[in-house]
Amino acid sequence: MSFTVTKTAPALITPSEPTPSGHILPLSFFDRLPFLRVFLVDMIMVYGRGDQPAKVIKEAVAKALVHYYPLAGRLTTDTDDGELSVACTGEGVWFVEATADCRMEDVNYLQVEPLMIPKEQMLPSHPEGVDPYTLPLMIQVTQFRCGGFAFATRANHAVFDGIGAGQIKVAIGEMARGLKHPTVKPVWCRDVIRKPIPSQISATEPHDTDLSPVSDIKFTNNQTNIECCSFDLSLDHINHLKDRFAKEVGKICSVFDVITAKLWQSRTRAIGLQPQTEVSLTFLLNIRQVVLHNELPPDGGYYGNCLVPLVNKAPSGQIANAPLFEIVRLIKEAKDDLLRKDSASLIGGMPPYKKPSYADLSIVDWRRLGLYEADFGWGGPMFLVPLNEHTVTSCSTYLFKSPVASKKDVCLVTYCIVKEHLEAFRAEMNDFT
């Protein structure tokens, strides 16, 4: 059965009050990294109910843009230094209203991969002749027959990261609920994160993340042979392992550390690479308090890119055969080591983007980005639906909150296994579900 989404023509939402305009705001060194400036992040947030959500959200966006006025501007390189910057033009954010001719349950709450409604119908569009890479943010609100709605965004990663996205969407929700000002005041200060001077970077800092070629499995980078699967992980079991780790190792680890260790080991065992083949695990760390500690107020507010990738590498045989707590320790120590570095080393140590192989795995923790707190007046989202990150990193996994409020499980969604390894991967992960 096919379903149809009917869209209105895109319309510009401008700030509801006058905002600073006619000047250029610089972006940070992180913001200007090549793989971020051309990365349009597509995402859907699924809500169970809402009364005229498009109208409410449209008005809230206009109010939020007073505080987040750079989002109403345009990305440009027409500057004195030729660097990517934001021109504060006040033009506004493109907004699309849409209706779907079905209920959310008819399309499984947009949780099936591929989507039962083509993602192009769910995502905001822009008028012909407009360059999407100049737009910080576009929004579409789609109302379903059941009363639920989807809040979809397309955002240029050069302007904000995942934590920034959460902060912005929470602010829109606060405006929708009648607040006059966002609880967290937005902070720009992009010029603090400057391009590092080579002499400031530690000589031991890694700058090349190339892995040895993986020749013992065929892997294409077009996602056609990658299977999507999900697991509901028991928090009771994970907390039990955390307690055991604390007793045996004498240190405290997080839920993320335990899940990530189990995931890395399970996948490494399932894909069966040669023991000497190097495998990698990459995840993001928030370094706001390290590089911006003198600039940020106590409640934060910086919404630019400040999540850095931490790449963990080890021989396949070591990860497959080590006790789980040893892998937890490796992950925890890598995190602690990175956060002990000084600001210059953190900024200068950003690894260049490399095309990944099947030996590489990445994980993103969507529970901690603030997105679940984006409440437009009818509660937070039931589901988050990232639509394109796994096409960039290839072997990706995501941690979500359980959509059932009474459950304390963590939902793990993976795009990291080819079909021939799926059964073995599920078997390895089963004792965590």
From Swiss-Prot:
<protein>
    <recommendedName>
        <fullName>Myricetin 3-O-glucosyl 1,2-rhamnoside 6'-O-caffeoyltransferase AT1</fullName>
        <ecNumber>2.3.1.-</ecNumber>
    </recommendedName>
</protein>
<dbReference type="InterPro" id="IPR050898">
    <property type="entry name" value="Plant_acyltransferase"/>
</dbReference>
<keyword id="KW-0808">Transferase</keyword>
<comment type="similarity">
    <text>Belongs to the plant acyltransferase family.</text>
</comment>
<dbReference type="Pfam" id="PF02458">
    <property type="entry name" value="Transferase"/>
</dbReference>
<dbReference type="InterPro" id="IPR023213">
    <property type="entry name" value="CAT-like_dom_sf"/>
</dbReference>
<dbReference type="GO" id="GO:0016746">
    <property type="term" value="F:acyltransferase activity"/>
</dbReference>
<feature type="active site" description="Proton acceptor">
    <location>
        <position position="157"/>
    </location>
</feature>
<keyword id="KW-0012">Acyltransferase</keyword>
<comment type="function">
    <text>Caffeoyltransferase involved in montbretin A (MbA) biosynthesis. Catalyzes the caffeoylation of myricetin 3-O-beta-D-glucosyl 1,2-alpha-L-rhamnoside (MRG) to produce myricetin 3-O-(6'-O-caffeoyl)-beta-D-glucosyl 1,2-alpha-L-rhamnoside (mini-MbA), a precursor of MbA. Mini-MbA and MbA are potent inhibitors of human pancreatic alpha-amylase and are being developed as drug candidates to treat type-2 diabetes. In vitro, is able to catalyze the caffeoylation of quercetin 3-O-sophoroside (QGG), although QGG may not be a physiological substrate in vivo.</text>
</comment>
<feature type="active site" description="Proton acceptor">
    <location>
        <position position="375"/>
    </location>
</feature>
<comment type="pathway">
    <text>Flavonoid metabolism.</text>
</comment>
